Amino acid sequence: MTKAKFITFEGIDGAGKSTHLSFVADLLRASKKNVVVTREPGGTSLGEALRTILLHEKMHLETEALLMFAARREHIAQLIEPALARGDWVISDRFTDATFAYQGGGRKLDRQKLSVLEQWVHPHLQPDLTLLFDVPLDVARARLDATRTLDKFEQEQADFFAATRAEYLRRAAEFPQRFRIIDSTQAIATIQEQLRDIIAGLAP
């Protein structure tokens, strides 16, 4: 029997990752896997309360990072680790790579500080697979403008998203064993075929 896996979806706002999350969850369920779908910040009652604060309240950049990791610690303890222990597959819309990208890249917070928090909060847990949906900034912005009211991160300027995207790509280069980069400008059907192949290799 295939060991339960932890899969994360990453990308700048407007990259389209959330569109494909349910597709991957359905693929796994079709192969008789129990699947837990969650998100960050969020996933628990405390995490969802912190999400509202993080997405809408102004704060010091270090406060923002600390709250992200506080929500993550609760998420791991209350949802992710218990699910994996049960043998359930976990799919999370964002995880620690997002904090490195947004707070480290976009906000320019010292990467070493984030690494210390990462080692404290989850020294042994890393995703088995990280799907990074990559897209040019102008495409991402057009998608955001066409969808909904924007939160404080989505309202950031182009240089913030350029730095965030660059940090995502740096993380992918640093951890190539778990990252798969998806060109999110492709047709949905093309992306889903790629996802089907990737998941087939992970969940035979």
UniProtKB/Swiss-Prot annotation:
Transmembrane segments: none annotated. It catalyses: dTMP + ATP = dTDP + ADP. It comes from the Bacteria. Keywords: ATP-binding, Kinase, Nucleotide biosynthesis, Nucleotide-binding, Transferase. GO terms for molecular function: ATP binding; dTMP kinase activity. It holds the Pfam family Thymidylate_kin. InterPro entries: P-loop_NTPase, Thymidylate_kin-like_dom, Thymidylate_kinase. ATP binds at G11, I12, D13, G14, A15, G16, K17, S18. Disulfide bonds: none annotated. Its EC number is 2.7.4.9. GO terms for biological process: dTDP biosynthetic process; dTTP biosynthetic process; dUDP biosynthetic process. One of its GO terms (cellular component) is cytosol. Belongs to the thymidylate kinase family. Phosphorylation of dTMP to form dTDP in both de novo and salvage pathways of dTTP synthesis. This is Thymidylate kinase. The gene is tmk.
